[in-house]
């Protein structure tokens, strides 16, 4: 996205050809990182925010110089690559720090914070903790209490960058930005339209994300009419199952198999695991997401539908499949 607008479809192949011509042997994420940087350079942007894809030691985003490094709350994910413990994961992520470059962190579990502090000392980076800063009092465009934690981190980094570059930094402008923030697939509400039931989309695909999603659902007083969930086979599903069962409650739970992804977990196998302990509640596998969406529509009540939407959560690849089916929902 550049200034909140998705990169036009016709620019992707043009930029991709230039990257492939210059560096034909890049990995997938190296390729996407290079393509993004090329797009940003052509647009002449003043500020780029890049999200690491996997850890911080060997992630493609570490190839570029940076002015600041940010750590949102670190949780369990990608254990097969980064390691089986939170310390392993935090140690890898901490390698994103650079000598002399300030690093900002949201509140962390004790072992994760220890890793960040140790690496900061080893690399000569100043680690700035944001836990003691006040929460932004303005309304947020992104739902859930965890987004206030993220917003506090974003404001801390922005204040520092604005001071360094002598950019205008008016509180009312920051408040407007927080209120208008939009992130597809992060507690994203989609009203009933074009045959779709009312939906809330969330890319929660690990225990850390599902805990935040569960809290956001509860705080919004949402009682789902149905839930659609799926994930990749290389995820540690055992720690995610209790969250999905609690989020769904007695509502029907539909489990599609993510299409065109060799890492996708089979919907029937995942449904069997999720059905354990759900009693008579419906837990039904479907061959694909489009079928699950059709099935869930009949469970949405005619009245108070906003309080009883269908929750679509899990793998970002599942959400990607949804956005391919309904591209108009990507925009705010």
Regions found by a protein language model. Give the residues of each.
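Conserved catalytic-core segment of NTP-binding enzymes
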Residues: 54-58, 65-123, 240
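ATP-dependent carboxylate-amine ligase catalytic core
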Residues: 1-64, 82, 110
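Short, high-confidence coil segments that cap the C-terminus of an alpha-helix
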Residues: 24, 45-46, 222, 305-307
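Flexible, gly/pro- and Lys/Arg-enriched active-site loops
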Residues: 56, 60-63, 74-83, 255-274, ...
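Nucleotide phosphate-binding/pyrophosphate-handling subdomain across enzymes
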Residues: 47-50, 60-62, 66-70, 74-75, ...
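C-terminal helical cap/extension that packs against the catalytic core
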Residues: 106-128, 198-200, 241-309
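Active-site-proximal loop/hinge segments that shape catalytic or ion-binding/gating pockets
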Residues: 315
């Amino acid at each position: 996205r550049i200034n909140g607008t998705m990169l036009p479809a016709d620019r992707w192949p043009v930029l991709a050809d230039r990257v492939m011509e210059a560096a034909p042997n890049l990995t997938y994420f190296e390729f996407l990182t290079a393509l993004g940087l090329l797009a940003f350079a052509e647009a002449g942007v003043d500020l780029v925010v890049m999200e690491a894809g996997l850890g911080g030691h060997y992630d493609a985003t570490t190839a570029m110089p940076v002015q600041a490094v940010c750590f949102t709350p670190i949780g369990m994910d990608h254990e097969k690559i980064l390691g089986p413990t939170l310390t392993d994961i935090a140690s890898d992520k901490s390698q994103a720090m650079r000598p002399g470059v300030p690093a900002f962190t949201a509140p962390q579990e004790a072992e994760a914070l220890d890793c960040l502090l140790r690496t900061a000392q080893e690399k000569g980076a100043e680690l700035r903790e944001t836990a003691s800063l006040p929460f932004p009092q303005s309304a947020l465009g992104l739902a859930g209490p965890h987004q206030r934690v993220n917003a506090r981190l974003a404001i801390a980094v922005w204040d520092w960058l604005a001071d360094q570059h002598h950019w205008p930094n008016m509180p009312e402008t920051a408040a407007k930005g927080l209120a208008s923030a939009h992130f597809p697939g992060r507690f994203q509400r989609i009203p009933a339209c074009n045959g779709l039931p009312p939906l809330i989309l969330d890319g929660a695909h690990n225990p850390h994300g599902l805990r935040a999603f569960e809290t956001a659902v509860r705080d919004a007083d949402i009682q789902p009419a149905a839930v659609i969930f799926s994930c990749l086979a290389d995820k540690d599903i055992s720690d995610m199952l209790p969250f999905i069962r609690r989020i769904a409650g007695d509502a029907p739970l539909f489990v599609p198999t993510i299409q065109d992804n060799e890492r996708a977990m089979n919907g029937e196998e995942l449904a069997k695991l999720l059905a354990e302990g759900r009693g008579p509640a419906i837990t039904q596998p479907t061959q694909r997401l489009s079928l699950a969406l059709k099935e869930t529509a009949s469970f949405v009540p005619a009245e108070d539908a906003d309080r009883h939407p269908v929750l679509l959560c899990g793998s970002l690849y599942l959400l990607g499949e949804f956005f391919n089916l309904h591209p108009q929902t990507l925009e705010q």
